Structure formats: C-alpha cells, structure tokens
C-alpha cells in the first residue's frame, strides 16, 4: 500500500476504446513510479499523430511517449515535486513547461528547453494553495505567457489569479500582473477563445466561492 506518499507508487492507465464503447474497455500501463501525482497534460512534441503526456508528482515532472510495442519512454523535465503542469512555446518555437510546485504549493515555475536540459526559472514564490495553470499567447506577442491561480484554502489566504509575461526572448526575465483576488478561489482555469476574436480568454472556476468567471481578452 501507500502511506504518507511512500510505499507502492500509483498506476497511470490508458483506456483503449472498443468498437462498441458500451463494452468493457481494455487498459494498459502507462507508468508506475510516481507518488502523489496531481495532474497530467496531453502534448504532441514529436512528428507522429499520437499524443504524449506531461505528468507531475512527488518524483518530478516527466514527458511520457508511447512506443510501438505499447510501452512508454520517459524523460525527466524536473525532479522538483510538482502539482500542476502545462506546456507552451516561445516566439522562436522553443518549448516551455510551466508548473506549480509542490502540490498545492507556493511556487510558479517555468522550465525552458536548453539543449538537452531544462532551465528552471522561478516566477513567483507567494502562492497559497496553487491550483491552476494555463499557457497561451494572450498578448499576441508570438510566444506564450503563463496564467496561474491559487485557492487560499490550505493555508488560508486571499486567493487570486496572476498573469506572468516574459520580458525577453529567452524567457529568463518576467513581469507579473494581478488579475483577480478574493472574489474567486481558483479550483481550475482554462484558456480558450470564447468569442472567436482570435484572442484566448481565461475561464476560472471557484469551488470554495461557488462561482465561474470569464476574463475577456481585450488586449
């Protein structure tokens, strides 16, 4: 078993859809090495049509890619305990990975691909119960920015949403903009162009505050 995030690791399973979806779905093992994993994110970083997974947990953030034999390759992005994970691109097409660390944590972090390694840039250390992330080009700069939210449930604090904007093309310097505060305790958020004006908007859901808020992108 597993107690206090030690012992048997969790299992991540893939479900294969049968021709008749009302029948039993077969499962296959994706990975079995993480403890206290809180989030994963589908990506497509290679040239095939199949998606891969970014997953984060106590053992860090990992990229998982399914091979032809059904097993999965894994490559580490970071060994820091992560709770949320999303990916994005710089204007030059370089990949970034954004995380909240640790689970329900205080840090917002951006990892930038640097050769075979990932450079870690800490964007914020003041979150209380960080719980949501998205990467998108909200400002039409040609590269993605990071939006992140926190709940303020444990420890108790005023919740909020912040937008993090890179100040240079290397994504090593950032500026921060506060978007909201106590009105919504962020359980999750998404980026999507809701009014089809070509600009991603931000949809934020609050569980503790029982509300939903849309930040319309008027930039």
Q: PLM features: residue spans?
A:
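Beta-propeller-forming repeat regions
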Residues: 1-219
């Amino acid at each position: 078993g597993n107690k206090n995030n030690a012992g048997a690791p969790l299992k991540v399973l893939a479900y294969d859809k049968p021709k008749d979806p009302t029948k039993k779905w077969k499962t296959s093992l994706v990975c079995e090495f993480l403890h206290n994993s809180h989030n994963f994110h589908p990506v497509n970083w290679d040239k095939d049509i199949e998606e891969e997974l970014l997953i984060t947990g106590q053992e860090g953030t990992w990229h998982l890619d399914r091979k032809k034999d059904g097993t999965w390759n894994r490559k580490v992005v970071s060994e820091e305990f992560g709770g949320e994970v999303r990916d994005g691109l710089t204007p030059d097409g370089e990949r970034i990975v954004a995380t909240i660390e640790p689970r329900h944590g205080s840090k917002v972090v951006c990892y930038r691909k640097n050769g075979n390694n990932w450079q870690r840039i800490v964007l914020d250390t003041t979150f209380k119960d960080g719980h949501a992330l998205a990467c998108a080009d909200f400002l039409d700069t040609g590269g993605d920015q990071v939006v992140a939210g926190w709940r303020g449930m444990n420890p108790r604090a005023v919740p909020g949403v912040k937008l993090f904007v890179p100040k240079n093309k290397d994504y090593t310097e950032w500026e921060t903009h506060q978007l909201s505060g106590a009105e919504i305790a962020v359980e999750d958020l998404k980026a999507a162009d809701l009014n089809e004006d070509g600009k991603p908007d931000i949809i934020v859901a609050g569980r503790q505050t029982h509300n939903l808020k849309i930040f319309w992108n008027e930039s």
